[in-house]
UniProtKB/Swiss-Prot annotation:
It comes from Buchnera aphidicola subsp. Schizaphis graminum (strain Sg). This is Putative flagellar protein FlgJ homolog. GO terms for biological process: bacterial-type flagellum organization. Pfam families: Rod-binding (PF10135). Keywords: Bacterial flagellum biogenesis. This protein is shorter than other FlgJ proteins and lacks the muramidase domain. It may be degenerating and may no longer be functional. Belongs to the FlgJ family.
Amino acid sequence: MKNDLSLFNIINYRTKFINDLKYQVKNNPKKYQLETAKEVESLFIQMLLKSMRNSLTQDNLLDSNQSRFYTEIYDQKISKEIAKRGIGLTHIILQQIQKINNNFYL
């Protein structure tokens, strides 16, 4: 049960981070556009890793709540590291954010 609560806290932290980022973008959109694009790329990579891992480990003997908990944390850290170097999505996402902001301010 403790691991479930810890995972819940991690999810809440990530949600709070995204909500804080939304607030910052509203107040100073140009400053936080790149950070937002990087975070979206990181979330995409994390979802990609999770989907790949789920397709491989469905009937694993070592599959347990604890292993899923640590795997989730590992995937989150790996996705952040991969996103630092980028997979090419940040630039595309940034263009979309800028296009939305330009249309919003017209």
